[in-house]
């Protein structure tokens, strides 16, 4: 509607005649072929997110890592495999003497090693914590993919809005060029006016080519994120209704610990601490029980035996002590990594909140101040041009300013949506849930 009003204003005040039925298309798809509206249906963000959750290769791989980490948990808590030994002792060197000599016998033994109490349980708990960290890494990966998908979606939305404005601009300068040409032919305008109008139209054509290429590039990126052939066409993003969003600061502050980035680091720190505790138990020996049966022929009695074997940590200075120091260093590293992530998330949240606030203020400024003022300026310049007080170049500058302000407005709309997407990824949930939790 705005484009139609601007077009009518330019035509009427420049003195051009608007022929009946000559409507101006304000929205066009990158392809100039007929039937574009059928080729480019409405593209819904929720549908893209749903497909990405199911088909995106990074998400599928991260989900597979969860399964593999869970399979490792029972392995870490299992006892070592038992050992079975079958042997024979012969009395004498020259011949097989079983049944002839009392010392000849067949032997069967079985042994089982039991780690010192607490070792296996700590090992299993550490593996469980690592699996939980892998799950949080999956959530982090999934949310990162969705964040990138949203960012590309809103960039595509802005590119389409830019194409709308360029198409509007192109149509206006085609009409201005036609009017300038008629005025030049009748001696009412200079050649400079005609040249200026032509130059602006050619620049608009160049911008349209670049925007169409940008749209195709963004469509390929989105297709890649949803595991779709990059060459397949996508629809046009559905229309946004820019509204100011109230973010509960207290709820946002409390939700920092729910960030998948922080929860992943927490799980890794807990796993490192459990491994450190397990390393301290390595000073204690493992116990191996062995039972043996010796089979002798008649009239000799069979024999049995039971032994207990302990491993002695004799070289603890270079082995067990070094292992404890190693695990302690890993735990310290994980702790500082967690604290660094906390600070990074908190800092990034403040940065995004600042970006959102700035974008909303600029949107308000463009919508209520710059664009209305630019429309008034355009109207005044056109009136002055008709009266012969200014050159056409002043009208063109005023028109360009108005269209540029409209473009910057939609740029801020897209930037705000992109910042909101990044904020939701950081806290791991929709912003709407923050306000719901305080009702």
Residue ranges and their predicted role:
Residues 4-14:
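Bacterial N-terminal signal peptides
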Residues 124-128, 191-199, 392-400:
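Short, charged, amphipathic alpha-helical segments
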Residues 18-88, 113-114, 230-273, 339-342, ...:
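Bacterial Sec-pathway N-terminal export signals of envelope proteins
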Residues 32-41, 85-119, 123, 235-246, ...:
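Small/polar, glycine/serine/threonine/aspartate-rich low-complexity segments that form flexible
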Residues 61-73, 141, 145-166, 175, ...:
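Amphipathic alpha-helical coiled-coil segments
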Residues 50-60, 67-82, 100, 108-125, ...:
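A glycine-/polar-enriched beta->alpha junction
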Residues 18, 141-258, 352-355, 359, ...:
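Periplasmic alpha-helical coiled-coil/stalk elements that build and connect Gram-negative outer-membrane
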Residues 6, 19-38, 408-439:
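Acidic, low-complexity, intrinsically disordered peripheral segments
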């Amino acid at each position: 509607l705005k484009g139609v009003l601007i077009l009518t204003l330019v035509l009427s005040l420049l003195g051009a005649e608007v022929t009946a039925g000559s409507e101006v298309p304000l929205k066009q798809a990158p392809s100039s072929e007929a039937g574009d509206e059928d080729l480019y249906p409405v593209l819904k963000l929720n549908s893209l997110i749903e497909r990405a959750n199911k088909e995106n290769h990074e998400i599928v791989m991260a989900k597979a890592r969860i399964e593999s980490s869970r399979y490792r948990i029972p392995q870490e808590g299992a006892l070592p495999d038992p050992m079975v030994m079958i042997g024979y002792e012969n009395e004498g060197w020259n011949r097989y003497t079983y049944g002839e000599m009392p010392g000849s016998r067949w032997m069967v033994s079985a042994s089982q090693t039991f780690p010192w109490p607490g070792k296996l349980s700590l090992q299993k708990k550490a593996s469980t914590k690592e699996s939980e960290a892998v799950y949080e890494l999956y959530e982090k990966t999934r949310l990162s993919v969705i964040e990138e998908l949203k960012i590309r979606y809103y960039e595509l939305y802005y590119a389409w809005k830019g194409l709308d404005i360029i198409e509007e601009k192109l149509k206006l300068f085609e009409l201005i060029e036609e009017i300038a040409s008629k005025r030049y032919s009748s001696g009412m305008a200079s050649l400079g006016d005609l040249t200026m109008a032509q130059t602006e139209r050619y620049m608009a054509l160049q911008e349209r080519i670049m925007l169409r290429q940008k749209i195709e590039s963004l469509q390929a990126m989105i297709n890649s994120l949803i595991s779709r052939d990059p060459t397949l066409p996508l629809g046009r993003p559905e229309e946004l209704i820019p509204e100011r969003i109230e973010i509960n600061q207290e709820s946002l502050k409390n939700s920092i610990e729910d960030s998948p980035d922080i929860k992943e680091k927490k799980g890794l720190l807990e796993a490192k601490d459990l491994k450190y505790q397990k390393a301290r138990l390595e000073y204690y020996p493992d116990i191996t029980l062995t039972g043996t049966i010796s089979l002798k022929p008649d009239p000799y009695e069979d024999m049995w035996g039971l032994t207990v074997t302990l491993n002695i940590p004799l070289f603890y200075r270079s082995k067990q002590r070094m292992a404890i120091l190693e695990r302690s260093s890993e735990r310290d590293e994980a702790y500082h990594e967690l604290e660094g992530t906390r600070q990074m998330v908190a800092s990034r949240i403040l940065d995004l909140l600042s970006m959102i606030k700035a974008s909303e203020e600029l949107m308000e400024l463009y919508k209520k101040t710059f664009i209305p003022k630019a429309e008034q300026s355009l109207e005044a310049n056109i009136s002055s041009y008709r009266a012969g007080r200014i050159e056409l170049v002043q009208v063109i500058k005023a028109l360009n300013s108005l269209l540029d302000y409209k473009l910057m407005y939609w740029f801020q709309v897209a930037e705000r949506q992109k910042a909101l997407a990044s904020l939701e990824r950081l806290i791991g949930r929709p912003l709407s849930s923050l306000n719901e939790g305080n009702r």
